[in-house]
Regions:
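An N-terminal hydrophobic leader/cap segment in hydrolases
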Residues: 35-70
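Conserved alpha/beta-hydrolase "acid-adjacent" motif
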Residues: 248-254
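Catalytic active-site module of serine/aspartate enzymes centered on a nucleophile-bearing elbow/loop
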Residues: 283-305
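Short beta-strand/loop motif that positions the catalytic acidic residue
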Residues: 234-235, 240-243, 247
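Alpha/beta-hydrolase fold nucleophile elbow
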Residues: 155-167
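Catalytic histidine neighborhood in serine/cysteine hydrolases
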Residues: 259-277
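Hydrolase active-site cap/lid region
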Residues: 175-235
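Membrane-embedded segments
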Residues: 72-149
Length: 305
């Protein structure tokens, strides 16, 4: 069995950070950097990948399989596949956020496996050991390829594939579900409704970039990437929106807006006091039970099966 240490490096590549320019002397150079990005892809704005092994699944006592398969453009993706404890009722495909890599999210597999689900955690192109470079369109294609891979290896008797998107992965999961009708249900945590809105929100946190916060998003970001433009197309498949009310990275109101654009069946669960992607830590067992129950109901399962 291939170990993750053969795929991941010991330390990450430092991410680009445009909001820590230390002095007024660099104000002009900071603006030049931003306007330079206007001529580039969204890669430098939204994505901060690295190849560090954050969590070793061996230390969690998790048996796993390192898997590789092609994305829709032929680039090789690397993922980690966890088997359910007991017979699997379905497979959860996890779409992570815009930073680090797949190894930062393995703890989620613990409760999902106990709930009867196989779990596929994969890296977008350019993250971890996956080939290529990420983009809004490309991450969706990577998720579609991952859903198809998971569908092809469903356990006997399993009811189907469901998606779990977190942070930027919410936009990815929404796009993938629209393109891949085999997806049975989605849990969407800590996401945003619009790439332009979240870009503007982040720019306004910096006094250097605030003056261009209204100008740059329309230049840098296409509306066609926005999940709120397509989320209604997922119906009648069920959606569970989750967000922490104390999220200072992605404001909870953005999930509320995305939920408002979705059609039924849908649920919105706001968790008081939870920060960005801290809902599991704050809500604990209630979080685990809510998600497992939601997925099981979406797959047509009852307490007796």
């Amino acid at each position: 069995m291939r170990h993750l240490n053969t795929f991941f490096r010991a330390s990450p590549t430092p991410p680009i950070n445009f909001v820590t320019i230390p002095s007024m002397k660099k104000w002009v150079s900071g603006l030049f950097a931003v306007f330079f990005l206007a001529g580039c892809t969204a890669h430098r704005i939204f994505y901060f990948p690295d190849s560090k092994l954050y969590v070793d699944p061996d230390k969690l006592g998790l048996a796993y399989e390192v898997v590789t398969y092609p994305s829709l453009n032929g680039k090789q993706l690397v993922g980690v596949y966890f088997k359910a404890e007991g017979p699997a009722v379905g497979t959860v495909v996890h779409c992570h956020g815009n930073a680090h890599n797949v190894s930062d999210h393995f703890p989620l597999a613990l409760f999902l496996r106990k709930g009867g689900f196989d779990v596929l955690c994969f890296d977008y192109q350019g993250f971890g050991a996956s080939e290529g470079r990420p983009s809004p369109e490309g991450t969706v294609e990577d998720a579609v390829a991952s859903v198809r891979y998971a569908s092809a290896r469903l356990a006997p008797g399993a009811r189907g594939v469901v998606l779990f998107g977190q942070s930027l992965g919410v936009a990815v999961a929404v796009g993938a579900a629209v393109r891949e009708p085999s997806v049975k249900a989605l849990v969407l945590e800590g996401g945003f409704n619009s790439y332009r809105v979240i870009t503007r929100t982040v720019l306004r946190r910096s006094w250097i970039l605030w003056p261009v916060s209204a100008i740059l998003p329309p230049i840098l970001v296409r509306k066609t990437w926005d999940p709120d433009k397509i989320v209604a197309e997922i119906s009648p498949r069920p959606l569970l929106f989750i967000h922490g009310t104390a999220d200072r990275v992605v404001p909870a109101v953005l999930t509320e807006r995305l939920s408002a654009r979705a059609r039924d069946p849908k649920e919105l669960w706001l968790i008081p006091g939870a920060g960005h992607l801290q809902c599991h830590r704050v809500a604990g067992a209630a979080y685990e039970e809510k998600i497992i129950d939601f997925y099981r109901r979406a797959l047509g399962l009852t307490e007796n099966n």
